[in-house]
Amino acid sequence: MRYIKFFKELNNKNVNLVGGKNASIGEMFQELVPIGIKVPDGFAITSEAYWYLLEQGGAKQKIIELLENVDATEIDVLKIRSKQIRELIFGTPFPSDLRDEIFQAYEILSQQYHMKEADVAVRSSATAEDLPDASFAGQQDTYLNIKGKTELIHYIKSCLASLFTDRAISYRASRGFDHLKVALSVGVQKMVRADKGSAGVMFSIDTETGFKDAVFITSAWGLGENVVGGTINPDEFYVFKPTLEQNKRPIIKRQLGNKTQKMVYAPRGSEHPTRNIKTTKKEWQSFSLSDEDVLILAKYAIEIEKHYSKEAKQYRPMDIEWAKDGESGEIFIVQARPETVQSQKSKEESQVFEKFKFKNPNEKKEIILQGRAIGSKIGSGKVRIINDLEHMNSFKEGEILVTDNTDPDWEPCMKKASAVITNRGGRTCHAAIVAREIGVPAIVGVSGATDSLYTGMEITVSCAEGEEGYVYAGIYEHEIERVELSNMQETQTKIYINIGNPEKAFGFSQLPNHGVGLARMEMIILNQIKAHPLALVDLHHKKSVKEKNEIENLMAGYANPKDFFVKKIAEGIGMISAAFYPKPVIVRTSDFKSNEYMRMLGGSSYEPNEENPMLGYRGASRYYSESYNEAFSWECEALALVREEMGLTNMKVMIPFLRTIEEGKKVLEILRKNNLESGKNGLEIYIMCELPVNVILADDFLSLFDGFSIGSNDLTQLTLGVDRDSELVSHVFDERNEAMLKMFKKAIEACKRHNKYCGICGQAPSDYPEVTEFLVKEGITSISLNPDSVIPTWNAVAKLEKELKEHGLTEH
């Protein structure tokens, strides 16, 4: 056949003939199907067929005339001309020989699947589409559940006409593509019955930070167009590549989306071949993929990335669409294309750490809305709410676009915006891809944004605070911090990072670092669990109906309270451990005080009213107590899951506020019973050296544990007898006090005697350069810092070590 190529005949060398999308499907058919990756079969109508059609009745010359002198920024003119061109294409009949070939290929495909008329997806594939430096995200149309020759011909024509929507013309013009040097091929692919299963998009790289070792998967019930088009908030999953390839099960994040609707087949004879129906409560409260499905998809992503990288002779992260057949249970890859944002960063750019931050971080800001952050920038300006494309020309340069959902038709408008906010959408929808590509901060899935905000309102949009994006009332000044990482000198003293929020881990891992010196378990409980641990252990007692309902809503998607707690904690710790892998990540077990636990959901039923919570029921004393030990055993299970199931053996454990040797033995026994034993699979167990007794009896504690991390905050408080929360005596609280320096020195010397680890994770090194200098001179193993202190402290330590070496004074 002259104008038809079956997928098995194609590969990536055929882009000019069948476009990027079809060439890529052919490539997978030839190279990846043989190794077990499933791809639905089909055929491509070549770009030669497109030119053949335009030759009929002088259509090509008429298109040239209509596009002459069109300015892509003149939206009204663009709309009129694009409509005229599409009508021209629709009015041009297919030559009979071309139509006959299409019908013959469709019959062959139908017979292959033992069907009279196969249900197919009809997808556009532009010859300039899906190239590494341009996503063409959604620029041409896709139609699902097309059945029969009449429908097939109609929707193929619709695809060809979609090459001349106003958005597609604008996009090509902005990228310097000649309109009549970009041709369109059409792919016809057997449908996967995802209407009875689920579908979505995955990336073989983290889309926001460029972290290379994670697969990011989005998923929803039904056909995948709702995920791609951003009309729902999908489920999200992250899988860690290195340990997945070691046959571990490293699902390091699960996030339940609301999935309010799903796209299914419409009855035959309907106006449209698909329709959206509401999901049931059970569907939106359940994950749309099982863990097994998530791991299969991640393995597919790794193999696809490896193949395309090998072919390109360079690292090539991929953007992949997938579908799960609800009848057979099989998972199929339906498209794969190069990722177009993170992969295009130059080597020089990757050597620069760039961070957007507020000029006055301590200034109080009112959060009015939040959603999923796209990018890592900050934008501010006046709101412009636009509910439909007809009013797009009212949008002014520098305004903040607020709408229900930005599909690629909005691209000319998005280019002018200082930020974008949508009611609906996930991080892999077309709008998110385009926002990243043009470098505009966007927050998607902000429920009720168009109702809560109003045109003319001044707001600030921040995507610089992790995966959650925040909308603040008012304008707040921001600045950009840029650091040349290539200029950083290596240090002997290890520089670690303190981290409490797993969502920031991928970004923080790009700072110069040797690992994580303090990952705070209690912050993960606070932000991920939100309920008091004992309120989960004891779900059916001591609670109001309201509290019980709130807890059950938090648990949606998980089998029971224990499953929720253990997996959520493991995901948080896993995310941090994966971000810094294989560098050490020291996780401190929970260290909330009774007054802090009391403020959590359901907490008032389980906590005593203490006169002095700072010195009361906290740290190790909780772990073996009759009232709390079951909750602590769940914590231990989560830690064991990270090491054993996820394979993240770089994670180490640290026990806080350990008062006596006897307590130490009790805690070690609980850890052992939960498969956490020093030396087993490289595990090290440290304690916080934060009580004077830890220093006084350092040799005894170090006979039980693998090292110390000095907690300078509590150690200063308890050595100087100062309540660190009291303003009245705050002037006395000073880690530079001579007594404190002696405490630090004794702790370091004890660890050296036992040849064991000694770090510091308190606030002192972040605040006082002279404390850092003292610790380096004493030969401390590591200094763990808040992220904003890492770069200046690193440079100071490197300079100091150089001076010490020159004078022969180094302690290392």
Curated annotation (Swiss-Prot):
Family: Belongs to the PEP-utilizing enzyme family.
Other information: The reaction takes place in three steps, mediated by a phosphocarrier histidine residue located on the surface of the central domain. The two first partial reactions are catalyzed at an active site located on the N-terminal domain, and the third partial reaction is catalyzed at an active site located on the C-terminal domain. For catalytic turnover, the central domain swivels from the concave surface of the N-terminal domain to that of the C-terminal domain.
Pathway(s) this gene product operates in, as recorded in its UniProt entry: Carbohydrate biosynthesis; gluconeogenesis
Gene (UniProt): ppsA
Domain notes: The N-terminal domain contains the ATP/Pi binding site, the central domain the pyrophosphate/phosphate carrier histidine, and the C-terminal domain the pyruvate binding site.
Pfam family, one: PEP-utilizers
UniProt keyword annotations, A-Z: ATP-binding, Kinase, Magnesium, Metal-binding, Nucleotide-binding, Transferase
Reactions it catalyzes: pyruvate + ATP + H2O = phosphoenolpyruvate + AMP + phosphate + 2 H(+)
NCBIfam families: PEP_synth (TIGR01418), PRK06464.1 (NF005057)
GO BP term, pick one: gluconeogenesis
SUPFAM superfamilies, A to Z: Glutathione synthetase ATP-binding domain-like, Phosphoenolpyruvate/pyruvate domain, Phosphohistidine domain
Active site: 430 (tele-phosphohistidine intermediate), 761 (proton donor)
Molecular function terms from GO: ATP binding; metal ion binding; pyruvate, water dikinase activity
Annotated function: Catalyzes the phosphorylation of pyruvate to phosphoenolpyruvate.
Annotated positions binding substrate: 520, 588, 690, 711-714
Cofactor(s) needed for function: Mg(2+)
Naturally occurring in which organism (per UniProt): Helicobacter pylori (strain ATCC 700392 / 26695) (Campylobacter pylori)
EC number in record: 2.7.9.2
Full protein name: Phosphoenolpyruvate synthase
Gene3D superfamilies (UniProt xref): ATP-grasp fold, A domain, ATP-grasp fold, B domain, Phosphoenolpyruvate-binding domains, Phosphohistidine domain
